[in-house]
C-alpha cells in the first residue's frame, strides 16, 4: 500500500465492532442457553477465527446478510462437541488464549493451532493455571499447538505474574466450568471486558481491587447486543487528527470503557481536543460519540499501569512521536516484544527508515520530538498494528510511503485503508 501525504483530516466515522468484545461475546454465546444476536460484530480475521473454532466445536451460528455485520449464535449450553480436527486459531492470540479456558472445561481432547506468527507466541501464561485447575495440556515448549485434555476442573486461587486481560478472561471462563470458586489476582488492573460480558450473559462475579472471583456451574442466557466501535481501531484516526491542527473528526458508537479510555486522557494531555456526547451504557459497556479537533501536539511518557492500559495503542502513539514537541517515552512495555511481531523492534526499525532518531530499550522506546519524517519503503512485519500505525505517520511525511505486507490489516480491520482515505484531505 502506498500512502501519500495529507494536508488535513476531517469527517465522520463509525467503526467495526470492538475486537475484544466480539471475541468474548461469541465465546459466551456459544456456551449460553438459547440464541444470541450480535450486531456490528468485528469484521477482522481474528474474530472470524473465533467463529470458525466455535463451529468446529459444534456451535451453530449464522452471519445475516445486509448491513450491520450481524452474527446469530445458537447456544449449546456449557457442553460443546468434540472437534474432528485441530481448532484453527489463525493469527489470533485472543482466540487461542481465551477459548482454551472453555475447551479445558470440556470432557474431550482438543488441539489448538495457528499460523506461523501465533506458533511463536508464549502460552505458558494460560498453560500453567489451567494445569493447576486439572486440565492436561501439552505444547511445543510453551508455544502452540496446544493439546488440551479437558475434564473436571477445580477452582483455584491464582496470582497472575503478567498483567493480561486475555489470561484473566481465560481463567474466568475456566472458572465458570469448574467446581467451586476461582479467585484471580492481577498485578495491574487490565481491561475488564471479560467480567462485563460475563455479567451481560447472566453470570455473577465479585471484584475487589485487582481481585476477581467467579463461582463455577452458573448457567448463562443469550443476549441481543450492538457491539460498540473498536477503540483500538479508533486510535489510528485519533492520532491522524492529532497530526493536523485544523482537523475535525466525529466518531460514533465508540466504546468508552474506563479500562480502555486512558488513550483519550493521554491524547488530550498531548493537545488533542476531545469532547464526548451521547454517553450511554449498553450491556455494561459505556458507549459514546466523540467530537475531535486538532491542536499543538505535546509529548508524553507512558509507563506502569498506563502501559498495560495502552498496550495495543502504543504502536501508533510511537509512530507519531517524532511530530510531537517533546517526544514520547515508553517504559514497562516488554510485552510488546511477544505480540504479532516484536513491536518495539518493528517501531524502531521503521522510524529509523523514515529518518527519525530512536532509542530502543529492552522494555520500551524513547523517541525525541521536533523531527520530520521522510516517505520511504517500510515493512509491516506481518503485524496489523504496525502497518496501520505507520500509515498514520506517513500522512505527515515528506513524499510517498510504501508499506509492504499491508494486507495484514485484515486481521483486525479490513476496511482500514478505505476508511482512512475517506477522511484525509490532500
Label each residue range with its predicted role:
Residues 1-426:
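Structural preference for solvent-exposed beta-strand-turn elements
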Amino acid at each position: 500500500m502506498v500512502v501519500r501525504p495529507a494536508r488535513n483530516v476531517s469527517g465522520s466515522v463509525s467503526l467495526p465492532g470492538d475486537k475484544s468484545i466480539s471475541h468474548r461475546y461469541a465465546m459466551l454465546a456459544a456456551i449460553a442457553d438459547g440464541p444470541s444476536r450480535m450486531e456490528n460484530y468485528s469484521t477482522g480475521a481474528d474474530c472470524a477465527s473465533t467463529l470458525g473454532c466455535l463451529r468446529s466445536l459444534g456451535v451453530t451460528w449464522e452471519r445475516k446478510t445486509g448491513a450491520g455485520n450481524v452474527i446469530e449464535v445458537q447456544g449449546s449450553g456449557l457442553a460443546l462437541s468434540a472437534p474432528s480436527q485441530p481448532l484453527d486459531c489463525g493469527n489470533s492470540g485472543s482466540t487461542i488464549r481465551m477459548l482454551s479456558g472453555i475447551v479445558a472445561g470440556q470432557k474431550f481432547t482438543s488441539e489448538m493451532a495457528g499460523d506461523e506468527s501465533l506458533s511463536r507466541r508464549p502460552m505458558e501464561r494460560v498453560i500453567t493455571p489451567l494445569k493447576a485447575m486439572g486440565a492436561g495440556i501439552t505444547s511445543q515448549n510453551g508455544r502452540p499447538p496446544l493439546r488440551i485434555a479437558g475434564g473436571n476442573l477445580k477452582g483455584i486461587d491464582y496470582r497472575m505474574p503478567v498483567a493480561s486481560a486475555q489470561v484473566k478472561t481465560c481463567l474466568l471462563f475456566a472458572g465458570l466450568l469448574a467446581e467451586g470458586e476461582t479467585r484471580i489476582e492481577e498485578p495491574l488492573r487490565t481491561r475488564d471486558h471479560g467480567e462485563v460480558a460475563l455479567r451481560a450473559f447472566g453470570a455473577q462475579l465479585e471484584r475487589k481491587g485487582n481481585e476477581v472471583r467467579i463461582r463455577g456451574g452458573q448457567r448463562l442466557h443469550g443476549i441481543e447486543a450492538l457491539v460498540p466501535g473498536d477503540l483500538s481501531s479508533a486510535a489510528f484516526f485519533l492520532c491522524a487528527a492529532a497530526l493536523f491542527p485544523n482537523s475535525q473528526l466525529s466518531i460514533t458508537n465508540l466504546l468508552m470503557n474506563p479500562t480502555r479510555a486512558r488513550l483519550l486522557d493521554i491524547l488530550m494531555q498531548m493537545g488533542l481536543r476531545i469532547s464526548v456526547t451521547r454517553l450511554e451504557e449498553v450491556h455494561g459497556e459505556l458507549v459514546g460519540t466523540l467530537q475531535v479537533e486538532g491542536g499543538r501536539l505535546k509529548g508524553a511518557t507512558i509507563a506502569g499501569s498506563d502501559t498495560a492500559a495502552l498496550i495495543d495503542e502504543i504502536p501508533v502513539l510511537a509512530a507519531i512521536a517524532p511530530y510531537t514537541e517533546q517526544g514520547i517515552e515508553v517504559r514497562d512495555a516488554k510485552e510488546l516484544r511477544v505480540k504479532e511481531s516484536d513491536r518495539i523492534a518493528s517501531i524502531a526499525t521503521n522510524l529509523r527508515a523514515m529518518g527519525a532518531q530512536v532509542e530502543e530499550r529492552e522494555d520500551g522506546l524513547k523517541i525525541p520530538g521536533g523531527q520530520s519524517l521522510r516517505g520511504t519503503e517500510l515493512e509491516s512485519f506481518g503485524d496489523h498494528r504496525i502497518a496501520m500505525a505507520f500509515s498514520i505517520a506517513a500522512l505527515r511525511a515528506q513524499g510517498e510511503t510504501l508499506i509492504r505486507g499491508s494486507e495484514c490489516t485484515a486481521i483486525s480491520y479490513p476496511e482500514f485503508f478505505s476508511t482512512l482515505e475517506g477522511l484525509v484531505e490532500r
